[in-house]
Amino acid sequence: MDSLALGRWRQRRAEDLQVPGDVKRVCRRLEASGHERGCHQVNACALASWGPEDRELPSRGCLPAPRPESGQGRLSTGISQNGGRSSAQPCPRCIAGESGHFSHTKNH
């Protein structure tokens, strides 16, 4: 197998990369939200977004994501500051280095 050909499928084209105006997504794992002390279980989709498509009806019984309050990008009080994860369970999207996704790990 050609190792150069294997690496090509992983490269992203410039138009595939995130551009200004892309909707930011917040990842939430339902099983992780209950692990932290004082954090309540959240019943919502695993991925949520805030943008023009919020006006559409949710599909397959998923609840719409709460909008950030005061434009600060914070989640509702039902989710702890770090997205419901302990420091021993980092977010997979953070591990992957997804741009624009580190806001939930900052201590405000």
From Swiss-Prot:
Q: Where in this protein does the record put region Disordered?
A: 56-108
Bias regions of kind Polar residues — which residues?
73-89
Report the superkingdom from the record.
Answer: Eukaryota
How is this protein named in the record? Uncharacterized protein C10orf143
Natural source organism: Homo sapiens
